[in-house]
Amino acid sequence: MTAFDLHAPFVPKGDQPQAIEKLTTHLQSGHSRQTLLGATGTGKTFTMAKVIEEIGKPTLILAHNKTLAAQLCNEIRSFFPNNAVEYFISYYDYYQPEAYIPVTDTFIEKTASINEEIDMLRHSATRSLFERQDVIVVASISCIYGLGIPAEYLKASIPLKVGAEVDQRQLLRNLAAVQYTRNDVDLGRGRFRVKGDVLEIGPAYEDRIIRVEFFGDEIDAIRYVDPVTGETLQSLEGLNVYPARHFVTPTERLEMAVEAIDAERTAQVEHLEGAGKLLEAQRLNQRTRYDLEMLREVGYCNGVENYSRHLAGRQAGEPPECLVDYFPKDWLLIVDESHVTVPQIRGMYNGDQARKKVLIDHGFRLPSAADNRPLKSEEFWQKVGQCVFVSATPGLWEIELSENRVVEQVIRPTGVVDPEIFVRPTTGQVDDLLAEIQERVGRQERTLITTLTKRMAEDLTEYFEERGVRVRYLHSEINAIQRIEILRDLREGVFDVLIGVNLLREGLDLPEVSLVAILDADKEGFLRAERSLIQTIGRAARHVRGQAILYADNLTDSMEKAISETERRRKIQLAYNKKHGITPQPVKKGSDNAILAFLEVSRRLNTQELEDAYEQADDLPLESVPELITQLEAQMKEAAKNLEFEEAAKYRDRIKNLRSKLLGQQSP
């Protein structure tokens, strides 16, 4: 038995038992790379969970976007309710990196909005990795970016133990040194307050409050308490308080870093002047001197991450520490949808370096700023011991690395067969598709439509709306959380048809979808390649009446291969169903997502969105007004807390107007 305790209302069926056994055997034999070739709807996540339980190692599950990571984390948490299942994605709600455009001589300052709740989940992940063995972290590609030095982070943690003698003043100084701020009025995450002999800390990694009670200089009690009621949730003998930020720099290291930065500044200014770049040299000298002064005085400056090589004591070109460095020596990596995720790992470094080079060449940053970067692909894979690639369409790179350790999982436990595929001419395709949609609406089933261009998707959405179809258009400007909400609304029947371009392929778990329509299926290219077609067709593979219609005037090689592979899988499933007397059963899966619910509670509209919503309040449905009032109240309280009383008064007046509107419309 391992530390992982899997709970599931079903047992492995179909191809799952042999896939679990083979993957487990490969891993226990010490093989470093293997692939699970699992068709859509065959229960790949359950197979992953069983392998994790059997192997018993801390595991990182890597997904290629936040939406898929949230979906995976929710499923894995349901399988392992008693283990630490963590969620690690980028904590930016909005991020615009600094950049310089030489052609127009335009410098763009870095602007970012950090989601505090996601930051808390990131801290929770690293805390679990320090304290437990039964840890599963579901992460997006952001896990290959720098995260501070694990040893320094752990060394900076503050141990507290009942009965220990502690200098209270020194303890408060220690908390301030690891980025906690004192606030005796409003205790929140990353803050602490003192009331008599009681110290309360809002840890960076959870929403419970740590209460430390003293008797003189002796710690008398340590408790977790509810942040609202103050009720005791748990009494403890001891704990570690981890820093409020992952980047922790000891004083002596900071002093050494300042010297190194200053030396690099001198050398680079001389280099630029020697090359005749006097403006660039002056710019770099001025900017870096200001940053150095800030670092000496307060230990921080804007854009401090650009000095991370010096602050961490790394050599030039040395890879930064990231999430994988927080894992113990023996851990397991599972790469979900590997045919997309693996190329992402390769692409992150090159894009980052192209932007940094321009900044360095024009005197905005020192050359060492190039080392504030994500891992290179080869650096990442050097840190990985054992790995399982998971995909319905794995890439050649994964298959070659796995040698003969490619495990197929094609048979679905539910007996659901791969979609029937129909190829129809493009003439009259929209009206033909409308008839298909109406048929499915009558059966309360959903439809996905994929187009080649954004313009066509918009026009198609408008056309269907005019004909009474409840339709939405999923486009690239929709953020991760809104995307999850749209997919949930599709599942719950708020609308019936979802149209997109390259947004409807990997990992979408939509059992209600019975039809996938692919327009311009014969236009060869990335969006209509064999792998893309198989993935898109697979979105209907969870429904007992799943069908895919490919609108095309020619049969391309990619279409032939995709149709052939889907037909091969259909035959395998049909033969299995016949042999075992299985009648296909619809997939029953709730649409709730605990991660989504958490993020929805935490999400606040930004100021511009609130302005727009308020201006359009007259057009809002009545049931939406209370939500807008709640958002405005949150902004009003935030403004008052920051002593911005004029801003708070503006929100108060708007809330009054909205409440009047609400009362006026509700009265008979």
Curated annotation (Swiss-Prot):
Record-level GO cellular component terms: cytoplasm; excinuclease repair complex
GO terms of molecular function: ATP binding; ATP hydrolysis activity; DNA binding; excinuclease ABC activity; helicase activity
Locations listed in the record: Cytoplasm
Main location: cytoplasm
Free-text function comment from the UniProt entry: The UvrABC repair system catalyzes the recognition and processing of DNA lesions. A damage recognition complex composed of 2 UvrA and 2 UvrB subunits scans DNA for abnormalities. Upon binding of the UvrA(2)B(2) complex to a putative damaged site, the DNA wraps around one UvrB monomer. DNA wrap is dependent on ATP binding by UvrB and probably causes local melting of the DNA helix, facilitating insertion of UvrB beta-hairpin between the DNA strands. Then UvrB probes one DNA strand for the presence of a lesion.
Family to which the UniProt record says this protein belongs: Belongs to the UvrB family.
Name of the protein this chain belongs to: UvrABC system protein B
Organism listed in the record: Acaryochloris marina (strain MBIC 11017)
